[in-house]
Regions:
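Short hydrophobic beta-strand element within catalytic cores of glycosyltransferases
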Residues: 83-86, 102-105
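A short, glycine- and acidic-residue-rich donor-binding loop in the catalytic cores
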Residues: 70-76, 84, 91-96
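Acidic, amphipathic alpha-helical patches
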Residues: 49-50, 92, 173
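Aromatic "clamp/platform" in nucleotide-sugar-dependent glycosyltransferases that forms part
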Residues: 66
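Conserved sugar-transfer catalytic core signal across GT-A, GT-B, and GT-C glycosyltransferases
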Residues: 49, 73, 80
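Nucleotide-activated donor-binding/catalytic signature segment of Leloir-type glycosyltransferases, i.e.
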Residues: 11-52, 59
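C-terminal amphipathic helix plus adjacent low-complexity
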Residues: 6, 116-202
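A short alpha->beta transition loop at the rim of the catalytic pocket in nucleotide-sugar-dependent
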Residues: 57-59, 81, 88
Length: 202
């Protein structure tokens, strides 16, 4: 199952992705039995995403992202105990680890010129490219040891459900903000001295 889209959820975006899928499949000999690719294109509701995460045929979540600010879908997957295989770099490392998920190694490389996007992805930017051999090994490890990775994912689920509650994140944010603002000037109430009333002269 491939859930993705281009810059929009348009018909042209969907056609472009389908063309890319077919282009990749055509790189292999015609007598090879390739797996089916089911494209989910567009925006899904929270209920639909939850159904997808918990579908009995969905065994793991895989993302070879070049970089994430946070990676919400990845954390959502951990919250339901779904094994995660993902690029071993960027924001999602805050809630994933090598012992309870599969972090694929790679390296930071300059973005291709074709991916430069004005004011978004500048020519001097770098992004993370996975090591494809490690990714191949990761797929085999997941397939051959799914029970092991499901058990590890359950452990990570309990950790993240306890650690990333709204209450605890509010407390964490408060600690961070206080750490940087404790020495800032504070507003002080102006207290003028009390003066004795001057007697009127006769």
């Amino acid at each position: 199952i491939l859930k993705t889209s281009g810059a929009t959820y348009s018909i042209l975006s969907k056609k472009d992705i389908l063309d890319k899928i077919n282009g990749i499949k055509n790189m292999f000999p015609s007598d090879w039995k390739l797996p089916n690719v089911y494209l989910l294109h567009g925006d899904l509701t929270d209920e639909e995403m939850n159904y997808l995460y918990n579908h009995p045929k969905v065994k793991a979540m895989v993302s070879f992202t070049h970089g994430e600010g946070y990676g919400r879908p990845l954390q959502e997957a951990t919250m339901v105990g779904l094994p995660v295989m993902v690029s071993g770099w960027s924001g999602h490392i805050d809630f994933l680890n090598q012992h309870e998920s599969l972090l694929v190694p790679g390296k930071l490389e300059k973005v291709p010129q074709s991916q430069v996007w004005e004011n978004i992805i500048i020519p001097e930017s770098s992004w993370f490219n996975i090591d494809t051999n490690s990714a191949y090994q990761g797929f085999n490890m997941l397939h051959n040891n799914i029970k092991k990775y499901q058990s590890q994912a359950k452990s990570l689920m309990y950790t993240n459900r306890n650690k990333f509650t709204l209450e605890k994140m509010t407390q964490k944010l408060d600690e961070i903000v206080n750490n940087y603002t404790s020495d800032m000037p504070q507003q002080v109430e102006l207290q003028l001295p009390k003066l004795k009333k001057v007697k009127e002269s006769v």
